[in-house]
């Protein structure tokens, strides 16, 4: 993959536009998000996560994060759910078990999220570029 450099590896098309992520950009997103989950949230290898972002390029990033970190993706009873702000609004569990990931086409963090929840799209920006 590294030989592809700036060539697109992920293309996401929706009614709001088209986003292409190069190998470099995709790897950077995975690295930052991996560091966030491991160092920021202190998730350990084999922890369980649910990626509930639907048809969005962020889904491919977070699935890549699970592979890079050794996390296990599950549908039921995860340690952490990665989901959109709209899902956080109706979340019945503890806010500590839900990370809000923006569904903005360009990945801009949501400006307002429910109290007590982690704004994952904002937090990942504070973590290193290499995992």
Residue spans of the language-model regions?
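AMP-dependent adenylate-forming
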Residues: 1-21, 125, 131
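A general structural motif
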Residues: 7, 44-46, 78, 95
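Conserved N-terminal alpha-helix of the aminotransferase class I/II PLP-enzyme fold
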Residues: 11-13, 25-36
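Acidic, surface-exposed loops and disordered segments
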Residues: 14, 25-26, 51, 81
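Alpha-helical scaffold segments that form or flank carboxylate-/histidine-based iron centers
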Residues: 18, 23, 55-57
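Helix N-cap/beta->alpha junction signal
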Residues: 30, 55, 84-85
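Conserved AMP-binding/adenylate-forming
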Residues: 36-71, 76
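Structural core segment of the AMP-binding/adenylate-forming
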Residues: 64, 68-131
């Amino acid at each position: 993959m590294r030989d592809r450099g700036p060539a697109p590896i992920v293309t996401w098309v929706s009614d709001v536009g088209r986003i292409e992520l190069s190998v470099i950009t995709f790897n950077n997103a995975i690295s930052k998000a991996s560091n966030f989950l491991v160092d920021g949230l202190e998730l350990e290898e084999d922890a369980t996560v649910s990626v509930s972002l639907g048809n969005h390029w962020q889904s491919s990033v977070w699935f890549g994060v699970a592979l890079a970190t050794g996390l296990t993706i599950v549908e039921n009873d995860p340690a952490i759910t990665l989901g959109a702000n709209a899902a956080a609004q109706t979340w019945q569990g503890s806010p500590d078990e839900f990370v809000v990931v923006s569904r903005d086409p360009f990945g801009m963090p949501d400006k307002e999220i429910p109290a007590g929840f982690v704004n994952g799209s904002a937090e990942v920006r504070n973590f290193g570029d290499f995992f």
